[in-house]
Amino acid sequence: MNKFDIENLDLYYGENQALKAINLPIPVRQVTALIGPSGCGKSTLLRCLNRMNDLIEGVKITGKLAMDGEDIYGNVDVADLRIKVGMVFQKPNPFPMSIYENVAYGLRAQGIKDKKHIDEVVERSLRGAALWDEVKDRLKSHAFGLSGGQQQRLCIARTIAMEPDVILMDEPTSALDPIATHKIEELMEELKKNYTIVIVTHSMQQARRISDRTAFFLMGELVEHNDTQVIFSEPSDDRTRGYVNGDFG
């Protein structure tokens, strides 16, 4: 069963075509890794999944991108879409407020005022992001006092507090040390039990470790996609083989 079905998707920044006839199914409750050299279109595609590209002037998109069978570029509420499809960015970006308020922020923005309910969601979300035990005694402390890895997990907690269906991750560990990276990767194994995850990564080792499916992009084209084990051991295209073997990047 697929969470997203992408069919003949083209994207232009003005006259420049950044994505060319992309056809890609993204299965539900699995980790799909988007790989390829810089500028290949993988982050552009990621941002199509919650219409973040709408914020860029001069963008034009054609083709179909459906979530649960509904075209997300049709008559949909974009604000609701971005709740259902949360995003974690490359650099941790906690809000300039307490740990607690970071997680509660989205709930308050929706008009939720019940403190008991907010408390429950904050704890559940921090537990879901494997952060509760590290911060439960300092929830009122400023989020900027956390380490980089903790800040990134806080951003994940802030995302899952909104009860999304999908979590998009744009190189979420590129700014983290190996220990913090390992914790995020372990967390992803747990998160995929409840969420569909799509991750952009430059690390072949990371894609191999954490993803169920991998899609390889080159110069705006989707070269191939398959089970991750197949992409790394028996790719069908010589360009994929060259990339995963480190011949270019």
Swiss-Prot record:
Question: Where does this chain mainly localize?
Answer: membrane
Q: How the protein sits in the membrane?
A: Peripheral membrane protein
Tell me the enzyme class. translocase
Q: Which SUPFAM superfamilies match?
A: P-loop containing nucleoside triphosphate hydrolases
An MF annotation (GO) of this entry: ATPase-coupled phosphate ion transmembrane transporter activity
Gene Ontology cellular component annotations, sorted alphabetically = plasma membrane
> Which reaction equations make up its catalytic activity?
phosphate(out) + ATP + H2O = ADP + 2 phosphate(in) + H(+)
InterPro entries, per the entry: AAA+_ATPase, ABC_transporter-like_ATP-bd, ABC_transporter-like_CS, P-loop_NTPase, PstB-like
Alphabetized Gene3D superfamilies for the sequence: P-loop containing nucleotide triphosphate hydrolases
Q: Name one Pfam family in it.
A: ABC_tran
Q: Which UniProt keywords apply?
A: ATP-binding, Cell inner membrane, Cell membrane, Membrane, Nucleotide-binding, Phosphate transport, Translocase, Transport
Give the EC number.
7.3.2.1
Q: Where is the ABC transporter domain?
A: 4-244
Can you say where in the cell this protein is located?
A: Cell inner membrane
Which Gene Ontology terms describe the biological processes this protein takes part in? phosphate ion transmembrane transport
Could you name the domain of life of the organism this protein comes from?
Bacteria
Annotated NCBIfam families: 3a0107s01c2 (TIGR00972)
Q: Which family does the UniProt entry place this protein in?
A: Belongs to the ABC transporter superfamily. Phosphate importer (TC 3.A.1.7) family.
Q: How does it assemble?
A: The complex is composed of two ATP-binding proteins (PstB), two transmembrane proteins (PstC and PstA) and a solute-binding protein (PstS).
What is the protein name given in its UniProt record?
Phosphate import ATP-binding protein PstB 2
State the organism of origin. Answer: Vibrio vulnificus (strain CMCP6)
